[in-house]
Amino acid sequence: MKRKTKIVCTIGPASESVDKLVQLMEAGMNVARLNFSHGDHEEHGRRIANIREAAKRTGRTVAILLDTKGPEIRTHNMENGAIELKEGSKLVISMSEVLGTPEKISVTYPSLIDDVSVGAKILLDDGLISLEVNAVDKQAGEIVTTVLNGGVLKNKKGVNVPGVKVNLPGITEKDRADILFGIRQGIDFIAASFVRRASDVLEIRELLEAHDALHIQIIAKIENEEGVANIDEILEAADGLMVARGDLGVEIPAEEVPLIQKLLIKKCNMLGKPVITATQMLDSMQRNPRPTRAEASDVANAIFDGTDAVMLSGETAAGQYPVEAVKTMHQIALRTEQALEHRDILSQRTKESQTTITDAIGQSVAHTALNLDVAAIVTPTVSGKTPQMVAKYRPKAPIIAVTSNEAVSRRLALVWGVYTKEAPHVNTTDEMLDVAVDAAVRSGLVKHGDLVVITAGVPVGETGSTNLMKVHVISDLLAKGQGIGRKSAFGKAVVAKTAEEARQKMVDGGILVTVSTDADMMPAIEKAAAIITEEGGLTSHAAVVGLSLGIPVIVGVENATTLFKDGQEITVDGGFGAVYRGHASVL
C-alpha cells in the first residue's frame, strides 16, 4: 500500500545536504519547506539546488514551499542579549527603538500604540510572558504595562496582541524580496504567514501576476483570531491553508485550537483545496528517536480530521533524528489510512458538495471506484484540477495524475492520494486515453489485467472541463466476437478442431477454443470454464450450450484456432464479447 497523506519537511542545518535530502525523500518527503524567517537568499539558494539534485537522484517528484516571515511584530534587542521581567513590575513599551531593559523595551511596529487600549493583553515570546496595558501615552509614544507572567526575554522575540485588530501590511518589503527570489528559483508554493483577510492573499497574487508567476500556489497560514474570523473570504482567495498551530495557540486558548483545526480542515475539504496541519506534530523527535504516544495520536487525528498533509518543522530542520521523524510520520499515516471508512467519508462529502459538473464527475468516479474495487483512478490533467477534485472525495483507490507539465506534477505533491506520472502532450481523446493508461502502468501502481476508472476533460487540453468517466480494463485485447452471457472466466486455452482432440486435451477449468461445437464435444465442454468458436450465431450449438451451463461463450471469432495457442492464459469477457491476454479484472 502507498501512503496517501502527504508529508511536508522543513529543510534546515540538519537536513540540507544532498545525501540527507535523498534519505528524506526515500523516507517519504513530498514537499520541502524553506522557512524564510531564518537564513538569507544565498543559503536558501543552495538548499533549493540541493533539493533539485536529490530529487533528480531519487527520480521523485518533490515540490518546494517558500514560507514567508510575514508581517509580524517583534521586540528589538535586549541589554546583554536578555533581560528578566518580574511578575507585578511595570514595563514601558516604546514605539522608538531602544536597547531593552527590565523597565523599558521597544517593538518593530510603531503603530501598536494606535491599535491597543487600556486592559488589552500583550504577549511576548510565544505567550510565555504576558503583559496588561495600564496606560497609552501617544504623545510620548509609549505603552505602560504590568507584567502578569514574568520570565527571561531575549532579543527579537515575537509579540502577539490577542483580540486586537492590528493594521500591519499584507506583506512586508522582506516578504516581497523573498517572493521575487522564489519566483526566480522556480518554487511551487508560497505559504503566506499571518494572513488576516483575503486582501493579504490578493496582495501576493498581484505580485505573482506582475511577474508572470500565477502558476505558484498560495497557501494561507491561519495564525490569529482575525484569520479564523475571516476564513471564508481567505479560502476564496487562497489555493489552500496551513493550520499553523504554534502562533494560533498563542493568540487563542489551547483548548480552542483542536476545534479550530477541525473547522479549518473541514472548510478546505468542502472546497477540495489542500490543507496542511503543522507545528509540534512530532516535536519530541527533535531530541528522541521515538515519538510520544500523544504525538502519534496527534498525527493520526489530523488524518481522521481530513488533512491533506502533515508537516515537520524543527524535527527535520534542526533535530537529531530528521530521517527517523519522516519514517515515523509515514508509518503513522499509513496505518491510520487503513482505518479510514471510505464509504462513510464519501457519503458525507457527497451530501455537502456543490452541484457543478466537475463535482458530479468527481463523486461518480469515487462511487464507481469504490463499488467496483478498482486498482486505481487515472486522471489525465492539464491544470491538476481533475485529480484535486477527485481527491476531495477521499477514494480508496490511488489517484494517478498523468500530465505533460512538470510544474503541475509538483503542485499535486500536496494533494491527498495523488501520485503523478509525466507523459507527452496529446491532441485527441483516443491518444489521451492510451497515453494515460500507459503512464499508469509505468507508475507501477497498476498492472495489465487491472480494472481502473479514467476521468478527464474533452476536448483535450482545455482547463476545467472535466466531463468524462470510463471504466477500463488494462489489458491487451486479443480478439472480439459476439458475447453470450454476462459472466467472465480466466484459464488456459485448449485449442481443438475436432471432438476427439477436445476430449483428449480438455482439462477442468480450461477454455475451449474451436471452430464449432456439437453433441460429440459435450464431455469436453462440461469441463470448460468458457468457449470460444469461429462459428457465429446466437442460436449456434456453443451459444445454446453455454447459456444452459451458465458459462461465458464468445462466437464468431475469426481464425480463433490459429490466433490462440495451447496453454495460453486468457480472460474471456462474455458481457463485452472480448478475449484479453492474461488475467484481466473484468466485470
UniProtKB/Swiss-Prot annotation:
Pfam families: PEP-utilizers (PF00391), PK (PF00224), PK_C (PF02887). Pathway: Carbohydrate degradation; glycolysis; pyruvate from D-glyceraldehyde 3-phosphate: step 5/5. It is an enzyme of class 2 (transferase). It comes from the Bacteria. Disulfide bonds: none annotated. Its EC number is 2.7.1.40. Substrate binds at R33, K221, G246, D247, T279. ATP binds at N35, F36, S37, H38, R74, K157. Gene3D superfamilies: Phosphoenolpyruvate-binding domains, Phosphohistidine domain, PK beta-barrel domain-like, Pyruvate kinase, C-terminal domain. The record marks K221 as: Transition state stabilizer. Exhibits homotropic positive cooperativity for PEP. Allosterically activated by ribose-5-phosphate, AMP and other nucleoside monophosphates but not by fructose-1,6-bisphosphate. It catalyses: pyruvate + ATP = phosphoenolpyruvate + ADP + H(+). Optimum pH is 7.2 at 30 degrees Celsius. Optimum pH is 6.8 at 60 degrees Celsius. Belongs to the pyruvate kinase family. Catalyzes the phosphoryl transfer from phosphoenolpyruvate (PEP) to ADP to form pyruvate and ATP. Has a broad specificity for nucleoside diphosphates and can use ADP, GDP, IDP and UDP. Contains an extra C-terminal sequence (ECTS), which contains a highly conserved PEP binding motif. This is Pyruvate kinase. It comes from Geobacillus stearothermophilus (Bacillus stearothermophilus). The gene is pyk.
